[in-house]
């Protein structure tokens, strides 16, 4: 029998999907629908008022050829928070292979949906394509944060070469209220060192808060972040923030007080570990 040499395409790839929805139940919130398969799992800490779903990637990270799909829906009048058990790690990929993460979220009228994943750590030669689509109904409250680390500075990790494409599309009743795209490729470290881009920072976070309360808290949020970022109102109820930091530890030092203020100290416990 002839033996064939393995190629990069022969390597096993991680595929996973997770879907969760919430509904109003007896004055609180409960799980309405749940599906999970492959390398994505969901855990639910006990809570009557909020459905808190914790995503777990059993593959241990994302690399070229992996595919993950996440769907979340907060039904009318319910509260749903989706977070991750730990930081997601994007490892080096084979040439021509890209890992894909697609997330679709929906918040119906009178609901509250928080999308609070922990950091995504990009390692040398990572190749990641992420898409986040959000569909809001009038009267829905929404919060998202997306922290990203370019290597870990304390470990001396190099991010001189990687490919990172990230797109966020938030719409309300079908009309766009926030569109953002990041595309970094090649010698990312040199790009990040430029004063007009990141001025040497190796950690960043994007935050969007859609709430009638947002404008009233903008001054308090500015005091928390100081000169580490910027915060402004895109619309009377749409607040956006961008943070930069030298590393992940410093980023968290600013980000957790921000999230505590916005969530009224209901930040998932996994963020405290």
Curated annotation (Swiss-Prot):
Which compartments is it annotated to reside in? Cytoplasm
What GO terms fall under cellular component here?
cytoplasm
Q: Which UniProt keywords apply?
A: Chaperone, Cytoplasm, Nickel insertion
Q: Does the keyword Chaperone apply?
A: yes
Annotated region described as Disordered, given as residue ranges: 1-29
| Function comment | Required for maturation of urease via the functional incorporation of the urease nickel metallocenter.
What's the family? Belongs to the UreD family.
Q: Per its record, how is this protein called by name?
A: Urease accessory protein UreD
Gene name of this polypeptide = ureD
């Amino acid at each position: 029998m002839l033996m064939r040499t393995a190629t990069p395409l022969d390597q096993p790839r991680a595929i996973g999907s997770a879907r969760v929805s919430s509904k109003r139940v007896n004055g609180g919130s409960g799980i309405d629908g749940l599906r999970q398969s492959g390398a994505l799992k969901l855990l639910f800490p006990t809570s009557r008022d909020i459905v808190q779903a914790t995503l777990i990637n059993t593959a241990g990270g994302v690399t070229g050829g992996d595919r993950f799909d996440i769907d979340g829906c907060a039904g009318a009048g319910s509260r749903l928070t989706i977070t991750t058990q730990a930081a997601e790690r994007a490892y080096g990929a084979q040439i021509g292979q890209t890992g894909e993460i697609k997330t679709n979220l929906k918040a119906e009228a009178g609901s509250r949906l928080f999308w609070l994943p922990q950091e995504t750590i990009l390692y040398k030669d990572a190749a990641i394509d992420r898409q986040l689509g959000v569909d809001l109904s009038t009267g829905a409250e929404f919060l998202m944060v997306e922290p990203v680390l370019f290597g870990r500075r304390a470990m001396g990790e190099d991010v001189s070469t990687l490919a990172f494409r990230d797109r966020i599309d938030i719409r309300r009743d079908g009309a766009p209220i926030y569109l953002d795209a990041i595309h970094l490729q090649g010698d990312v470290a040199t790009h990040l060192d430029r004063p007009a881009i990141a001025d040497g920072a190796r950690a960043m976070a994007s935050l969007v808060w859609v709430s009638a309360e947002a404008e009233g808290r903008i001054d308090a949020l500015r005091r928390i972040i100081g000169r580490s970022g910027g915060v402004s109102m895109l619309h009377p109820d749409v607040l956006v923030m961008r943070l930069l930091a030298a590393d992940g530890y410093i980023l968290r030092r600013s980000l957790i007080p921000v999230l505590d203020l916005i969530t009224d100290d209901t930040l998932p416990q996994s963020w405290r570990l």
